[in-house]
Amino acid sequence: MANLHEIIQWCDQTLKAAEFKDYAPNGLQIEGSTEVKRILCAVTASEDAIDAAIAQNADLLLVHHGYFWKGEPYPITGMRGNRIKKLIQNNISLVAYHLPLDAHPSLGNNIAIAEKLNLQNLEPLDLTEKHPIGNIGYLEQALSVDDFKAKLQNSFDFKVIHLPAEKKTIQKVGFCTGGAQDFIAKAALQNCDAYISGEVSERTFYEAKELGVHYFACGHHATERYGVQRLAQAISQQFTVESEYFELNNPI
């Protein structure tokens, strides 16, 4: 058993959450039990994840995508109201870390991608960022475009969308998990052969072709499964709590 606020303090410090300008609050979003025995982690605080937390008697739901995003309406009604009501009624805390959990050098989503693809000699995708959200890495050997796509599909268990460019082989790879397709321009500035993110926009087709960078959409959910699991495991090691991951196979 551990104290909720001690867990939050440790996470905030470990992830340097206060140093990020984000689109939603990082850390404790909804306060439930101050005593934590069990954590359920998930990519998104969906109703399915909340129901799983209730069924598993979790005291804390740890997610990458929480609530209270910039631009959302203030009233807590409808779908979001129903989710929050369930959390409060069941005394479950909601804890969310967004950009800090993308960027962390050992717990983050992006480092997990680099490790899965065995990308070496990592560099920031954007040299101006204090805590780089995206990165660049190098394959040990250049691969054909088809072989690289197959590697991605096997790694993420996802039907990868490929938007082609002219280059015949791929070795220098830019990547940023989630919905960072617009960072393809940053990858082009760094002379990447390919760029990986989660989602795709209509304009991305033209950008890949005209910028000369192969674009691969590997799934917003699929590329962001890893950070919450790593963070939950780290919490379990730091504190006397159990943790488990909830997977809902989101095709986006």
Predicted regions and their residues:
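Active-site catalytic microenvironments in core metabolic enzymes, especially phosphate/sugar-handling
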Residues: 1-252
